[in-house]
């Protein structure tokens, strides 16, 4: 899974759960680290607004999800903006390389397609 600092909120939680289920490597750079959410944005008389944290995520074991740090990758690949400006995404290229390596070493089997459901 590709991750970087633009991944936040669910983009922090999903890679964490992906890792805990050992579904594959996390490739890229650390996620943003923001999982305390807001609900509603009251407007102020000067047309500004204010937000107040109102909820937070926790793990399935009942512990709080680590706020403020993000999820570290298994394979660190920093973004290269100069390469990206030339059309090369070094994080994506590394992920493709890793996936090809995993397919070669572990194989790949297409899961069966379920039959169509009957809706009445």
Regions found by a protein language model. Give the residues of each.
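C-terminal "post-core" interaction segments
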Residues: 1-120
């Amino acid at each position: 899974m590709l991750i970087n600092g633009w991944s936040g909120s669910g983009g922090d939680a999903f890679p964490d759960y992906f890792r805990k289920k050992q579904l594959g490597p996390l490739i890229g750079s650390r996620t943003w680290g923001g999982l305390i959410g807001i609900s509603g944005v009251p407007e102020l008389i000067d047309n500004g607004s204010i937000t107040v944290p109102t909820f937070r995520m926790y793990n399935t074991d009942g512990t709080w999800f680590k706020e403020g740090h993000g999820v570290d990758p298994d394979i660190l690949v920093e973004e290269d903006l100069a390469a990206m400006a030339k059309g090369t995404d070094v994080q994506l290229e590394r992920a493709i390389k890793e996936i090809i390596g995993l397919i070669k070493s572990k194989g790949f089997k297409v899961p069966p397609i379920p039959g169509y459901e009957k809706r009445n």
